[in-house]
């Protein structure tokens, strides 16, 4: 049913009723994530972290830590600590967990904010330098 209103100048305006809001469809609940850990604002470029992350994604945790121990890239040390943190989270939540059955299920590397700095150049110019950061997320699962 539409209502009519009169404006100050005498014109009539018809107001349409506002449709009722639709409820959200019933979606299945997301599965609870397994043991996980995250690292934010890592001061290594995401491209460099992804090179190391691609090496250990899908590996058993023990093998992944062994590979990272002998990887010379700076990101390897940070990823190793992150995986050990996820293992500790698994032990904290579920009691004693066998590391041999845990696998690096997901390992995502996203770009964080860039810190912009300026490098003085010749004749009064300045070039912008972007110091990139990364956000890393690791989730462990059981071997299938």
From Swiss-Prot:
Annotated GO CC locations: cytosolic large ribosomal subunit
**Coiled-coil region:** none
**Cited PROSITE patterns:** RIBOSOMAL_L22 (PS00464)
Outline the segment boundaries, as ranges, of region: Disordered.
1-38
Instruction: Give the molecular function GO annotations.
Output: rRNA binding; structural constituent of ribosome
InterPro entries (UniProt xref): Ribosomal_uL22 (IPR001063), Ribosomal_uL22_bac/chlpt-type (IPR005727), Ribosomal_uL22_bac/org-type (IPR047867), Ribosomal_uL22_CS (IPR018260), Ribosomal_uL22_sf (IPR036394)
Keywords, ordered alphabetically: Ribonucleoprotein, Ribosomal protein, RNA-binding, rRNA-binding
Q: What GO terms describe the biological role, i.e. biological process, of this protein?
A: translation
Q: Which is an annotated Pfam family here? A: Ribosomal_L22
Ranges of compositional bias, category Basic residues: 9-27
Tell me the protein family, please. Belongs to the universal ribosomal protein uL22 family.
The annotated subunit structure for this chain is: Part of the 50S ribosomal subunit.
Q: What does this protein do?
A: This protein binds specifically to 23S rRNA; its binding is stimulated by other ribosomal proteins, e.g. L4, L17, and L20. It is important during the early stages of 50S assembly. It makes multiple contacts with different domains of the 23S rRNA in the assembled 50S subunit and ribosome.
Name-wise, this protein is: Large ribosomal subunit protein uL22
- Species annotation: Anaeromyxobacter sp. (strain Fw109-5)
Which gene is this protein's source?
rplV
């Amino acid at each position: 049913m539409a209502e009519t209103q009169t404006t100050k100048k005498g014109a009539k305006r018809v107001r349409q009723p506002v449709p009722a809001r639709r409820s959200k469809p019933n979606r299945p609940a997301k599965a609870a994530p397994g043991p996980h850990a995250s690292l934010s604002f890592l001061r290594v470029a995401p491209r460099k972290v992804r090179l190391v992350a691609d090496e250990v994604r899908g590996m058993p945790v023990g093998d992944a830590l062994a590979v990272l121990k002998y990887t010379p890239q700076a990101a390897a040390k940070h990823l190793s600590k992150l995986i050990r943190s996820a293992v500790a989270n698994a032990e904290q939540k579920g009691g004693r967990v066998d590391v041999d059955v845990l696998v690096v299920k997901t390992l995502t590397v996203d770009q964080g904010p860039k810190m912009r700095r300026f490098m003085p150049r010749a004749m009064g110019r300045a070039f912008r330098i972007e110091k990139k950061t990364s956000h890393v997320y690791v989730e462990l699962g059981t071997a299938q």
